[in-house]
């Protein structure tokens, strides 16, 4: 077994698991994936041994435990600098960190009303006004980055931590049929066409269990 492990939850529903998993994949580290449910007492007890916060994702590398998604990304950038998880330019790097932080701490209306559900396709879904404000801000971020750094990813020709942070939003937009500009839709298509995202989506679609409360429209 690899000395590096990443603890995650459902690939269909867990957006934070997707973010952490993408970051580790992009870093090039060889790792073992541990998937645990988070909705039972036994599962939470098991998860506590792997993640002090009892949250996913949680990375264990060379006896070091890192359990916050942004912290995982920063740690990976330090131990795998050749992966270029952050832009090399100082100004671009600051911009990348800023929009990663905005995703990490914001957009609560989007999270609550459009939960990630990769297997679902919600036709005619009505987006609430507060969630639409989040969508508008996210697409503004994307358009600014794509215009400034020329794509196809948010900071140019290579995926960075920013793309990992916003990948679950891509999946949400596709699930709920969110109306997007051609540039933003092209970005979504670029993300889901990457080998790592194809791998994740295939695994998500193969998951046997559905969480009933996440299978309804809000």
Q: What function would you assign to each model-found segment?
A:
Residues 1-128:
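GST-like domain detector, emphasizing the conserved glutathione-binding G-site
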Residues 6-8, 31-34, 157, 174-175, ...:
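Short, contiguous strand/loop micro-motifs
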Residues 15-16, 21, 67, 86, ...:
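Tryptophan-centric aromatic hotspots in well-structured domains and transmembrane helices
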Residues 37-39, 187, 205:
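Conserved beta-strand edge residues that scaffold enzyme active sites
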Residues 42-44, 192, 210-211:
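Short Asp/Glu-rich motifs
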Residues 49, 193, 202:
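Phosphate-coordinating loops and pocket residues in cytosolic domains that bind phosphorylated ligands
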Residues 103, 107-195:
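GST-like fold's C-terminal all-alpha helical module
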Residues 204-218:
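Acidic/histidine-enriched, glycine/proline-rich intrinsically disordered or flexible terminal extensions
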